Amino acid sequence: MAMEKNGSIFIKLGQHMSSMTYLLPNEWCDTFIPLQDKCPVSSYESLEKMVQKDTGQSLSDFFSEFEQRPVGAASLAQVHIATLKDTGERVAVKMQHPELDEWAPLDLGLTRFTFAALKRFFPEYDITWLAEELGKSLPEELDFAQEGRNATRVREYFSKIKDTPLVIPRVIWAKRRILVMEYQTGHRPDDLAYLDSHNIDRDEVSAALARIFNEMIFGKNAPLHCDPHGGNIAIRHNPKRRGKANFDVILYDHGLYRDIPLSLRRSYAKLWLAVLDVDEPRMRKYAYEVARIDEEHFPLFASAITGRDYRVVQKNVAMARSTEEKEAISDALGEGMLADLVQLLAQVPRVMLLILKTNDLSKFFRFELFILWFRDSELMNA
């Protein structure tokens, strides 16, 4: 794949596109999903030089042991297992790919040029806003000190939420290109063999993921994780937990967060209540409040946020998705709905696009579990 060969920024772009299930056809998104796990690896020597440059010290000054082979690599960084020299604690060390300092601005410029050229030749596919969003979010994601602050904040927020099996690795210290945190590991949420071999109920995992990410969207003052995909979530067997959830949900990669205004949270929640109640006048009212969607474009927007054919939205969005519905959506995309979606979402507030991005998680939890959580949420009584 060209994005994989061209390196970090383009892999990051591909990962972002893999999660755009609210906009792109499943066939496109599925093509980009392997980029969640296929990323470049920087040499140990280059990392040693980076640490020396950034801190004035060597890796051996911080760690008594440091595994040179990374246990994981992402588009912007890779993770090594190490042992802290002063405490003996086993930790995960997230280290930015050193060449990003030099190449990131050039790659961003090329991305903007490519999307601008695409708009010129295919004006109906204007996704220049995606390059703009990447240009805004990338500097934040490249600041690991900020990521450390984000992780600490979301860890503190969820410590007050009862019965949520969420684990956020504790941050020990952070620099702009180096992040040291406690070592926490698990398996991808779609590793069904692991779940089954440890008697982890798939529906319980679904329910936990639904609670966690919907809390981020609808919870008062909750921070919103804006890069949710299967590579950033891990499930770990934990028989010590009480109740039905005999597992932990580990959430990684806290580089990109947004705060949702309370008024938007409430209007978006009321939009979903209207969808579940099949109350079309209220759906249209709150669609305009959250995204300035007019009457003409509402059916398209309703399909985008629910992932369902609009005729289903008008009846009961909780009903099982039929083969006929899947074929209808596929046919509509081929008949120009994709171009209409691109143009529509280019006008939607950016924070709404980031909220919609959580739709990527729909492959990990059943829709009826989302509904069950949603109706019981405290925000509905606010």
Please identify what each model-predicted range represents.
Residues M1-I217, I235-L262, L273, P281-A382:
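Broad phosphate/nucleotide-binding scaffolds in NTP-utilizing and phosphate-metabolizing enzymes
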Residues K220-G230:
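Catalytic-loop of the protein kinase fold
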